[in-house]
Regions:
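Conserved active-site tyrosine of GNAT-family acetyltransferases
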Residues: 17, 109, 114
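A short, well-structured alpha-helix characteristic of acyl/acetyltransferase catalytic modules
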Residues: 10-20
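Conserved beta-strand in the GNAT
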Residues: 46-54, 59-66
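Conserved acetyl-CoA-binding loop-helix of GNAT-fold acetyltransferases
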Residues: 73-86, 111
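Conserved catalytic-core motifs of GNAT/GCN5-like acyltransferases
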Residues: 97-99, 115-133
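Conserved beta-hairpin
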Residues: 35-51, 79
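Conserved GNAT acetyl-CoA-binding A-motif
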Residues: 88-101
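Conserved N-terminal entry element of GNAT/NAT acetyltransferase domains
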Residues: 1-9, 138
Length: 138
């Protein structure tokens, strides 16, 4: 056996680790992960916002939310989130979850109906981290 400490992890290794974990999880919960994203582009085709995640375990796991600075506050983020939530509900999801940092958008997610279900705070030099959940009529 050889154990290595890596300072960088390439995409292939990261994906292999994720695949092995999902295979293990699948042996306990017979459900697979389905990618889901909603994106917005401007008239020139430039990406101006997006929400990306996956549906699994009857939940929408939101992994990335980004809106270009000049489009923040325009309602674009809310529209992208709503589109993903609608599709997640069609897929049988009962809730959505995400995590965010204190300098990112916890207030935005609260406006979307998410509630803080856990947090990590008080670590010097580190932003607070919030774990948030939104239940869909269940």
């Amino acid at each position: 056996m050889q154990i290595d400490l890596l300072q960088q992890v390439d995409d292939d290794l990261q994906n292999e680790l994720i695949d092995k974990l999902r295979t293990y999880n699948h042996s306990y919960i017979n459900e697979s992960s389905q990618p889901l994203a909603a994106i917005a582009r401007d008239s020139e085709g430039q990406l101006i916002g997006g929400v990306s995640g996956r549906s699994i375990y009857r939940q929408l796991l939101i992994e990335v939310v980004w809106v270009a600075k000049e489009h923040r506050g325009s309602g674009l983020g809310s529209r992208l989130m709503a589109l993903c939530e609608q599709e997640a509900i069609k897929r049988g999801c009962l809730a959505a979850q995400l995590d965010t940092l204190s300098f990112q958008a916890p207030a935005f997610y609260a406006k979307q109906g998410f509630e803080v279900v856990g947090s990590v705070s008080g670590i010097p030099g580190s932003p607070d981290r919030y774990f948030m959940c939104k239940r869909f009529n269940c």
